[in-house]
Amino acid sequence: MSSSAIQVAKTATYLPDLVEVQRASFKWFLEKGLIEELESFSPITDYTGKLELHFVGSEYRLKRPRHDVEEAKRRDATFASQMYVTCRLVNKETGEIKEQEVFIGELPLMTERGTFIINGAERVIVNQIVRSPGVYFKDEQDKNGRRTYNASVIPNRGAWLKFETDKNDLLHVRVDKTRKINAHVLMRAMGLSDNDVIDKLRHPEYYKKSIEAANDEGISSEDQALLELYKKLRPGEPPSVSGGQQLLQTRFFDPKRYDLGRVGRYKINKKLRLTIPDSVRTLTHEDVLSTLDYLINLELDVGGASLDDIDHLGNRRVRSVGELLQNQVRVGLNRLERIIKERMTVGETDSLTPAQLVNPKPLVAAIKEFFGSSQLSQFMDQTNPLAELTHKRRISALGPGGLTRERAGFAVRDIHPSHYGRLCPIETPEGPNAGLINSLATHARVNEYGFIETPFWKVENGRVLKQGDPIYLSADLEDECRVAPGDVATDSDGAILADLIPVRYRQDFEKVPPEQVDYVQLSPVQVISVATSLIPFLEHDDANRALMGSNMQRQAVPLLRPERPLVGTGLETQVARDSGMVPISRVNGTVTFVDATAIVVRDEEGVDHSHYLQKYQRSNQDTCLNQRPIVRQGDPVIVGQVLADGSACEGGEIALGQNVLIAYMPWEGYNYEDAILVSERLVNDDLYTSVHIEKYEIEARQTKLGPEEITREIPNVAEESLGNLDEMGIIRIGAFVESGDILVGKVTPKGESDQPPEEKLLRAIFGEKARDVRDNSLRVPSTERGRVVDVRIYTREQGDELPPGANMVVRVYVAQRRKIQVGDKMAGRHGNKGIISRILPREDMPYLPDGTPVDIVLNPLGVPSRMNVGQVFELLMGWAAANLDCRVKVVPFDEMYGAEKSQQTVETFLKEAAKQPGKEWIYNPDDPGKLQLIDGRSGEPFDQPVAVGYSHFLKLVHLVDDKIHARSTGPYSLVTQQPLGGKAQQGGQRLGEMEVWALEAYGAAYTLQELLTVKSDDMQGRNEALNAIVKGKPIPRPGTPESFKVLMRELQSLGLDIAVFTDEGKEVDLMQDVNPRRSTPSRPTYESLGVADYDED
């Protein structure tokens, strides 16, 4: 295939840096966030006020990380840097100042690709979307159908304050969901007189009722108000005026306990039209009075007051890595502060130094906890470059301080008009997380306040101004403008052509003349996410199928020989580059050296820059990471040019699958219900062969009876089984292993107690030689095979950190080539997925008039009801492109160039292809897009013409090799004694309620009985049945299932007198077969067989 690519639509497809959201946030943390946190804790004073400890936050420094990224991955270490900060200890009495640089902990650093290496594994911190701090006005209906209004002041941290109106026109306030307090009681407690409040309100007559109500309760002074406040907030404690004063002060006016944050202050100022400076982050009297005033205006429906929509993106903000990390550092410093205060009090004042006061442990623990176990710190999805990129751009509403799946209603998950150009309306998971986990749109960025912005071109007097940089608007700013879509037709000068333009204004659609348009959207792609924007002809697909297509592209396995799509969207190059999977030239220069492992570029000054390539490394998902050079020695390169292809890349573009010849027709029922019929060519030519690398690990531990040994001398193992092991008993690199082969030989000492006297005598004569050991080697699990590509040995002597009790750890990496086979899952880019049902010899496949057999036969019934017609456009466009020997880039939403544009474009291309000599059969005007296929088995043409073409098809990571599973005897659950579930637990197949109904309907009583008893949880019965099978005797009658006993016990624990009786009325003791000191074997016990037990034959 030639590398020329024809761009069909002329839309700007350059995108901003796609990992910017991660990098910029971490950079902010290092430059500002960390300093801010350190300085907010300074100074720490002891309880007597004599000593003060100051952190000089701006003078913190980071040491060089101990290991670089590759080394950290290899050693299972964390890629982190040590933090040092200058501390000053001031003695107030003597005026003495001690200054010292103190170690305060390790900070994991972000790699260039926006990830973190924690304990050797690459992790990503997902962005979280939460409700923005600020003031929110809502209305509620009481049970009589009357509307009441309320206002909540939500801080970044601290107590919530909620004002409410009621049916008697009284104002109340709640602090943190406690009991209602008359609003005027709070005003008086804050030291405001009646006139102070009344002067501030635009409609004081409404408020006077609340003043009267407070007076009626006998609360007329500040002291009485403080007492009342204390009673309501701390019921059951003796109230005091000073207590009330302190409570109010700490709850709302103490910066340590109450913080609106920059965002909260900005939002409150904006909503209530205040001008309080950014630095005031606690509540002020002005905030409270303005909130009351706004609430009264809402109640009276005057003064332009409006309610807030909490799902609007102007009221939700994104917390990225930097801020999440900052919050975690605050938790650590809080714990540290307590320790420092205690040490100041306990220690000798004169001899104390800052280093003795500061203990790095709490901060280290807080940071470790965040990266290791937070819901937002996730194991990176590395299946392919797109999966990696999408993971870094993910935005989750779950996590600490966010929503939970169970509580999230429909409104939160729904698409909101303000998502336009900010969050993708398509890419979200199916299932319980739908709508809670979103993806950032292609052009969106997060501003300094954490609100998502999207770019527009300015429009003046009906002319689109495309000079300079576009203007970024956040959701609440955009609401006030009239915004036209990106596909409005303009002339060469930028003047809008139509008389009336559809625009979005205040979350509604209207049509206005061009002069009234304020902004135009940048590109049609800016509404959707990166994964969705890789789907060609997206506009012809139903949204549900586009969602599946976006999600399945992330599950495509990198193939042995990737191939770029014939029909792309023009964003493939940037996705490959920004994912970090492809090495990029850092300078302008010339390539001076290339081999499989390194590329050297010499810049204009004559300095060499080396780029080392990844070779056959294992990804987090066991796929293979490998880089192949695409430049040659002597090639000139420029900054930013791709030097090598990564996994699932070709020619610097992302290439997730293969372009294969597809026919839409039924074939002997083999493509019923989305099944896929494929040609043997895909297997033989390795089109869909992928490399998977599995990691096996074994540790030699210190046991009570002595150390385990990694050795070649394994008892009762034939010499030929040891052929591939080296002198230490470890497999050699390059060996081919089958299931059951030894990878690492290991022996464990056996117990001494069970030794007969003659053994002891031999031991005494020949010394320790005859020591008893057990074979405990690492073997290749069943169903696995492959070639050993790497062996790593970790010991204490080399300075590796090993788990407690281990003397040595050995890791073996085995790579396997997996060809495509029946049971594997495949999919196109339009949500058209299926399982391979049969692999047909190529001579039996239907073939084209020129004799080419097709590669895949899909069911045509998969298209109409699912409404993903994009696949048909792709098919025919690919057919034309393949015959014209070119590649095509189709930008989504091309109907801006005229109605039915996609169809016209495809038809034009097909006619062009048919003009070539000998290719006129490609396009039949009577049946455009269809060909007469011939049956490979009989040589007869098929009845009807068939749609045939080239489509980009992916092999997904759900491989049948990893799913197929069988169980003979295995572990049981502790309580119910039923077999466990799942392949990892060696589980059984669940026989559920519906399966039981099916057997009941057939009257298959004995089959059903044994399925529910001896094959499941009748403990005695299953042991007896096993012995009977081994000895060849008839299987005894089943007993009582364990789960029935559990049910009986549960009913008895509810206080019900329930028991089981025989027909004669005699009670059955269910526990008779259970030993009182029952230690159930979790596996069945085999009785030893005597000679007499064997049958004669």
From Swiss-Prot:
Highest rank taxon of the organism: Bacteria
Keyword annotations of the record: DNA-directed RNA polymerase, Nucleotidyltransferase, Transcription, Transferase
Annotated InterPro entries: DNA-dir_RNA_pol_bsu_ext_1_sf (IPR042107), DNA-dir_RNA_pol_bsu_external_1 (IPR019462), DNA-dir_RNA_pol_su2 (IPR015712), DNA-dir_RNAP_su2_dom (IPR007120), DNA-dir_RNAP_su2_hyb_sf (IPR037033), RNA_pol_bsu_bac (IPR010243), RNA_pol_bsu_CS (IPR007121), RNA_pol_bsu_protrusion (IPR007644)
Protein name from the UniProt record: DNA-directed RNA polymerase subunit beta
Xref: PANTHER family: DNA-DIRECTED RNA POLYMERASE I SUBUNIT 2
NCBIfam families: PRK00405.1 (NF001616), rpoB (TIGR02013)
Family annotation (Gene3D superfamilies): 2.40.50.100, 2.40.50.150, 3.90.1100.10, DNA-directed RNA polymerase, beta subunit, external 1 domain, DNA-directed RNA polymerase, subunit 2, domain 6, RNA polymerase alpha subunit dimerisation domain, RNA polymerase Rpb2, domain 2
Enzyme class, UniProt record, top EC level: transferase
Subunit composition and interactions: In cyanobacteria the RNAP catalytic core is composed of 2 alpha, 1 beta, 1 beta', 1 gamma and 1 omega subunit. When a sigma factor is associated with the core the holoenzyme is formed, which can initiate transcription.
Its biological purpose: DNA-dependent RNA polymerase catalyzes the transcription of DNA into RNA using the four ribonucleoside triphosphates as substrates.
GO term, biological process aspect, one: DNA-templated transcription
Annotated gene: rpoB
Example of a GO MF term: DNA-directed RNA polymerase activity
Catalyzed reactions per annotation: RNA(n) + a ribonucleoside 5'-triphosphate = RNA(n+1) + diphosphate
SUPFAM superfamilies cross-referenced by the UniProt entry: beta and beta-prime subunits of DNA dependent RNA-polymerase
GO terms under cellular component: DNA-directed RNA polymerase complex
PROSITE patterns per the UniProt record, alphabetical: RNA_POL_BETA
Membrane-spanning segments: none
Residue ranges, annotated region (Disordered): 1072-1097
EC number per UniProt: 2.7.7.6
Similarity field: Belongs to the RNA polymerase beta chain family.
